[in-house]
Amino acid sequence: MSVNVSVTDGGVLEIEIDRPQARNAVNGEVAEGIAAALERLDAEDELRVGILTGAGGTFCSGMDLKAFVTGERPWAGDRGFAGITQRAAEKPLIAAVEGYALAGGFEIALACDLIVAGRDARFGIPEVKRGLVAAAGGLFRLPQRIPYHLAMELALTGDPIGAERAADVGIVNRLVEPGEALAGARELAAQIVRNAPLALAASKTVVQRAREWTEAEAWDEQGRIAGGVFGSEDAQEGAKAFAEKREPRWQGR
């Protein structure tokens, strides 16, 4: 299989692109595998967080150009390129990046909610060097998240930046030593899993959609999305656990 999926005891779904001989380039099988894993993540209540990584010390080098020239298209339904860029997971998803996250590989990472990277990782959209366009989200997601001029430099030169620079400008959440990205992502996932499922879902939705709203719309939409959380059993449990100085026992309702 080109995509390996496993579940930890803590309710974390780990998705590994396993084509190290091709630097984890995305072909049709990878796209379908990631899409299926994300469907599972969202469908199973016991799964709380996802981690997406690559085998063999490389995250992903983008689209498999050899497969592309033969007519293969690495899209998966409405999820888009690699089964993720147009519709990612509803639950939190962390990219654990080692080595290269280039072209579509960078766009996959940008489709995730959080990025943990080894200090020697490299990020870039070199499509212009190949007569192509970074059309899997990179060209509009980057200027939403980093300064305009840096986004334009990455888009027009095709040159990559290192993980430390990526962290400095806000692309990477946590830097770890080379080879420790997955461990770092697991640590971050464990922090997230400790929190209430309904509150996590509402918080992610509001943060994701905030840039679409005016301030007036934001208040209304936040109230609609988050209002039910305050009357939930989990909200009551959170208050009780705090008062009783114990860990909460979330029910997701």
Q: What spans do the regions from the language model cover?
A:
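Helix-loop "lid/cap" segments that line or gate small-molecule binding pockets
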Residues: 154-155, 206-210, 225-230
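Crotonase-fold acyl-CoA enzyme core
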Residues: 87-200, 231-232, 236-240, 246, ...
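Conserved CoA-thioester-binding segment of acyl-CoA-metabolizing enzymes
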Residues: 1-55, 183
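Terminal peptide-recognition signature
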Residues: 15, 19, 33-34, 52, ...
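Short, active-site-adjacent cap segments at secondary-structure transitions
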Residues: 57-61, 102-103, 124, 207
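Glycine- (often His-adjacent) and acidic-residue-rich active-site loop
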Residues: 22, 54-89, 131-132, 213-214, ...
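Short gly/ser/thr-rich secondary-structure transition/capping motifs
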Residues: 32-35, 74-79, 208-209
